[in-house]
Amino acid sequence: MEVEVTGPNRDLHSGVYGGAVANPINILCKMIASCHDENNHITVPGFYDKVQELSAEERAEMAKAPFNLEEYKKDLDINEERGEKGYSSNERTGIRPTLDVNGIWGGYTGEGAKTVLPSKAFAKISMRLVPNQSSKEIQSSPNKLINQ
């Protein structure tokens, strides 16, 4: 899905309007940041309503699947994994729903600097759904968070 935040009717010079006019990029960044809490749990209202938790037995079976965390980190050249607290990386990538920002843009992006307050900001967001989640229902969920 694509999110668009609109502000003034045109790009504005920040030296003249900065501090008095809302910046759509700042608003969009706050909206995106609010989609996850400190435990990387998705905060979109209703997002987890139909997600079935695995039983302890199912999680134990999943833990038997071949997955080497150190090799995973080395292959990606990362120092640590991140994700929803309480789940392994194998679980996070295989059985848990996700919400990710795939792109964000707005304002001046050319060479050099231009002190502009943009009139619009955009983001592309994807969600991985799991069984029982409905794409129709979930598609309206981010709007609930955004409109809060």
Task: For every predicted segment, state its role.
Residues 110-115:
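Short beta-strand/turn micro-motifs at beta-sheet edges
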Residues 9, 127-135:
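A generic structural motif
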Residues 5, 121-128:
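Short, hydrophobic beta-strand segments
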Residues 2-11:
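Residues forming anionic-ligand binding surfaces in small-molecule and nucleic-acid pockets
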Residues 9, 103-108:
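Short, well-ordered turn and helix-capping elements at secondary-structure junctions
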